[in-house]
């Protein structure tokens, strides 16, 4: 496995939208962990890409997350379940020249699963923040995570991913990230 760094990785947050999130099993935890990921990505200067599945019908990214998105963060509308079905997403990702993709968002068994499988097929090193993803039914989420693992995806907690990005307590942002996870 290739360790994620701010130089080689990007966070891909999938479809954390106004009409989707409330339908999830444990939406509050998923929301809080995605806020943590965005906050940490901001501190670490990690590239972020955000998608919205058919925003006309499902709404935009929830305000609690949208406030963390900077001007440089593309929010990409899509209709394909996989982010790789969006030419705009592919173009934005290509500009960033990243090798490692860290995924979070919803729904685990639909858009997230198809995006992750496409990323693996395209040769990316893929990490999924297992506690920052969800489906309406826990069983769907569990099955999707198992499928991802079987394809060589690293399925880790948000906290594990953040400390992998730091690699060392001597990292200049170690104290800041440590405070965020407590």
Question: What kind of feature is each model-predicted range?
Answer:
Residues 6-9, 25-49:
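A short alpha/beta connector and helix-capping loop motif
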Residues 1-10, 43-44, 56-182:
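Active-site-adjacent betaalpha module
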Residues 9-17:
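Active-site gating/metal-coordination segments in enzymes
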Residues 13-14, 48-53:
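Short beta-strand segments at enzyme active-site cores
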Residues 18-22:
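Short acidic, Gly/Ser-rich segments with clustered Asp/Glu that frequently serve as metal-coordination loops
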Residues 23-27, 138-140:
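Short, solvent-exposed loop/turn segments at secondary-structure boundaries
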């Amino acid at each position: 496995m290739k360790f994620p760094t701010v130089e080689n990785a990007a966070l891909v947050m999938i479809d954390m939208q106004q009409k989707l999130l409330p339908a999830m099993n444990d939406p509050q935890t998923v929301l809080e962990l995605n806020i943590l990921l965005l906050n940490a990505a901001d501190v670490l200067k990690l590239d972020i890409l955000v998608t919205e599945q058919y925003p006309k019908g499902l709404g935009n990214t929830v305000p609690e997350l949208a406030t963390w998105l900077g001007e440089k963060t593309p929010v990409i509308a899509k209709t394909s379940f996989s982010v790789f079905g969006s030419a705009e997403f592919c173009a934005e990702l290509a500009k960033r020249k990243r090798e490692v993709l860290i995924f979070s968002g919803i729904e685990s068994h639909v858009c997230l699963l198809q995006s992750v499988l496409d990323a693996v097929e395209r040769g990316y090193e893929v990490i999924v923040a297992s506690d920052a993803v969800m489906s309406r039914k826990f069983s769907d989420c569990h099955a999707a995570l198992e499928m991802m693992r079987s394809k060589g995806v690293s399925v880790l907690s948000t906290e594990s991913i953040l400390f992998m990005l730091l690699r060392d307590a001597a990292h200049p942002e170690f104290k800041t990230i440590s405070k965020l996870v407590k």
